[in-house]
């Protein structure tokens, strides 16, 4: 079996991948993550997931390389990582009482053959009605400024949800394990 490489610096994705109990290493790819004109959110995450994997193929020529990328979409608009309290407050205020769809692009590249599998896994979060005081308490408690949509579903962010909808809850955290297992099996990897 080729070695596994996770093309990411995300501690969330690293933690998720450990659940499969397969040995892997991590390396952060250096790519331009800019959104192209006329590119849908679906196409964006698929492209970036594959570009992340391809960026490391030369350095890791005999690996199965996992790339992933995620965006949150609210009312047709892509929500990026907020980076600041003020931007996170804006995002959560806009999301209050509505639904946010997370699109997670996933790519598995066999760097020996160049063959790849790519998919996009959606997951929708239906948000509670949130007042400004609740949003501010949450932001001060968790500081989710590095997370698309301004919350951490794996932490206190779940308290902001009314319900969720999707086929793979791990996609919400950034690495859809159910779909990844399908891809790994197609590459001959035994899981479990």
Swiss-Prot record:
Please name the GO terms of the biological process aspect recorded for this protein, alphabetically: nucleotide metabolic process
Q: Which UniProt keywords apply?
A: Cytoplasm, Hydrolase, Nucleotide metabolism
Task: Extract the SUPFAM superfamilies matched here.
Answer: ITPase-like
Q: InterPro entries per the record? A: ITPase-like_fam (IPR029001), Maf-like (IPR003697)
Q: Where in the cell is it found?
A: Cytoplasm
List, separated by semicolons, the cofactors it needs: a divalent metal cation
Q: What is its EC number?
A: 3.6.1.-
Gene3D superfamilies of this UniProt entry?
3.90.950.10
Q: Which GO terms describe its cellular component?
A: cytoplasm
Q: Which CDD domains match?
A: Maf
Q: Where is this site: Important for substrate specificity?
A: 12, 70, 154
Query: What is the reaction catalyzed?
Result: N(7)-methyl-GTP + H2O = N(7)-methyl-GMP + diphosphate + H(+)
As one GO molecular function, the record gives: nucleoside triphosphate diphosphatase activity
Which residues are named in the active-site annotation? 69 (proton acceptor)
Function field: Nucleoside triphosphate pyrophosphatase that hydrolyzes 7-methyl-GTP (m(7)GTP). May have a dual role in cell division arrest and in preventing the incorporation of modified nucleotides into cellular nucleic acids.
Checking NCBIfam families in the record gives: maf
Family assignment from sequence similarity: Belongs to the Maf family. YceF subfamily.
Write down what this protein is called.
7-methyl-GTP pyrophosphatase
Q: Which organism is it from?
A: Pseudomonas savastanoi pv. phaseolicola (strain 1448A / Race 6) (Pseudomonas syringae pv. phaseolicola (strain 1448A / Race 6))
């Amino acid at each position: 079996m080729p070695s596994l490489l996770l093309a990411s610096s995300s501690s969330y994705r690293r933690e998720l991948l450990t659940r499969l109990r397969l040995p892997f290493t991590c390396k952060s790819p250096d790519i331009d993550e800019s959104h192209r004109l006329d590119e849908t959110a679906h196409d964006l995450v698929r492209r970036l997931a594959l570009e992340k994997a391809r960026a490391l193929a030369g350095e890791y020529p005999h690996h199965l390389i996992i790339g992933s990328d995620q965006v949150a979409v609210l009312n047709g608009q892509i929500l990026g990582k907020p980076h600041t309290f003020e931007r996170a407050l804006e995002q959560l205020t806009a999301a209050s009482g509505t639904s946010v769809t997370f699109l997670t692009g996933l790519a598995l590249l066999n760097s020996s053959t160049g063959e790849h599998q790519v998919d996009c896994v959606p997951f929708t979060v239906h948000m509670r009605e949130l007042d400004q005081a609740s949003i501010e308490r949450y932001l001060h408690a968790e500081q989710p400024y590095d997370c698309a949509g301004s919350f951490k579903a794996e932490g206190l962010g779940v308290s902001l949800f009314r319900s969720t909808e999707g086929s793979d809850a791990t996609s919400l955290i950034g690495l859809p394990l159910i779909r990844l297992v399908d891809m790994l099996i197609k590459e001959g990897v035994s899981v479990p």
